[in-house]
Design a protein with these regions (language model features):
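Rossmann-like short-chain dehydrogenase/reductase
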Residues: 2-145
Length: 145
């Protein structure tokens, strides 16, 4: 489906009209194109503490299959699942690194108190998501906890 407004404001006259009227300029989002890597950028992966590692192992296999550049926080125990899947994960040093994807496995969260782990993962890196970046939280339905 075409976006007539988006196409219009991308033209030279459309830019002038939109600017003079104070209209918003839509952001061009990254889209998958055949032949390109599925993830074009770094992925920061985190995991809630807990005994069940099945979801983390699945996530690690998927990241291995798409050849993603993976980072982990130093305190995160998802490193073992990534290593078992053959993913070489780099340490997130907390510098100026930008991430295309923030991915958190929340499948071990079973009560509201454990939601603090989500906060601890995202609050330091939320402003370091690249344009057209993604924030993904993987979890279970309440019936399966």
């Amino acid at each position: 489906m075409s976006d007539r407004y988006g196409d219009f404001v991308q033209s030279s006259i459309g830019k002038k009209v939109a600017k003079n009227l104070g209209l918003p300029m839509p952001t061009t989002l990254d889209r998958f194109e055949s032949g390109e890597r599925l993830v074009r950028g770094s992925v920061l992966v985190g995991r809630a503490t807990g005994d069940d590692k099945s979801v983390s192992e699945s996530v690690a296999r998927i990241l291995s299959d798409v050849h993603a550049e993976v980072y982990v926080n130093s305190s995160d125990d998802i490193k073992d699942a990534l290593a078992d899947a053959g993913v070489e994960a780099k340490a997130n040093t907390g510098g100026d690194d930008q991430f295309k994807v923030l991915l958190f496995d929340a499948s071990n969260i079973s009560n509201a108190e454990q939601l603090k782990e989500l906060y601890e993962f995202f609050h330091t890196v939320a402003r370091r998501v690249e344009k057209s970046g993604r924030v993904v939280v993987v979890g279970r339905t309440p019936e399966n906890i």
